[in-house]
Amino acid sequence: MILQRALWATVFFLVFSPDAMSQIRPPNYDESLVPKFGLPHVLEGPDGKRIASPEAWPGQREYLLTILATQEYGIAPREPVDVTLEKIDDGDYASGDGVDQSIRRRQYAVTLARNGRSVRIDLLVWSPRAPAKQVGCFLGLNFRGNQSTSDDPNVRITTSWCDARHPGVVNNRATEASRGSQEERWPIRAIVGSGYAVATAHYGDIDPDYDDGFENGVHALFPEFRCSIEHPDRWGTIATWAWGLSRLADALEQIEHIDAARLMVVGHSRLGKTALWAGANDVRFKLVVSNNSGCGGAALSKRCYGESVAAINRSFPHWFNRNFRAYNDAEETMPFDQHQLIAAIAPRPVYIASASLDRWADPRGELLSGHHASPAYELFGKEGLAATSLPEVNRSIGGSIGYHLREGEHDLLSYDWQQFIAFARKHGL
């Protein structure tokens, strides 16, 4: 018993001490220094046996999700909340180029309520003005508030927490100066002109992006269900944002012109990690898009290239659950990796987008994650991602697992959206 207590004390110190969080190795950008590593096969269960039929997939998928939830993202509450939708604006798209009557702007207040507490999320939806039938919808969170995604003066300025480093943000609150500051990431005309709707909400409406001990945002709806030393497997902020995306899917199902059978989730960077986790858990998302999601997203952690587990846990200790810290500078001990996250989306299509200059996100690690997830798709007779070497820039490859390496930096640009739209069409969405 004394030995067991001593061992537990040692593990506790290694995982949770400030020194352990600060003493991390520098990033590796040399392929020759990538360690040799093994990956668990995506069809291999806890008994070491591989499933061989689509009928066995639901159980295997649940096994993968359980590993990822308990060891990385955190377990989210399963208790439902009341989701109500109130339309607060309905008009035409207005921009510096004038009013575009072919694009309809609608803004909704989505209220999540439980046990006398409530949280409001502002949902912005752009769609064709007069579609002949219900339309498919891309759903994604934004970083700076809905007003940052368009220069339309009618879009409400977010009142929730914003990162003070962003332009037009004062004392962690958005101002008019932030309007349209990220409209290049949301090419509304191109998306709606392709026949789709696009919906977005500010990630800060769901949970503010700082280490607050899980007190704010939708965590306030579940005060008894916080990640802590006593409960290290509970939801971190990425799992919280993903849970919020599912609640927004609940809301979109209530909008008459949205085809609830054609919901697609998309995200960039940390919100790409979020989109993957949301898509893996919620089968209502018929297509999942990860853009430059990197460590904790599409990139294989065991490659130890670019951002490491230790680096991400040190910089963003709230993103993942506390158990994930056990793998700081110890990726070789991980009994899982991100290819299992991609596989958990099967047989639904998933698209992984990288950028050529985004070494921090490890483009090759993102590609290889898709490659090693492919057996889950092949189980259903679908093509996955055969490539193990990066393709030439600005070329889309793959089957039900799509991939491209866009030329340029860590960003979400019109080229990326062009590929996402083409991929959606390819898969009949």
Across the structure, where does each feature detected by a protein language model lie?
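N-terminal pre-domain segments of enzymes
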Residues: 22-77
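C-terminal catalytic histidine-bearing segment of alpha/beta-hydrolase fold enzymes
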Residues: 315, 370-429
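Glycine-rich nucleophile elbow surrounding the catalytic serine of serine-hydrolase chemistry
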Residues: 267-277
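N-terminal cap/lid segment of alpha/beta-hydrolase-fold proteins
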Residues: 76, 80-136, 142-146, 154, ...
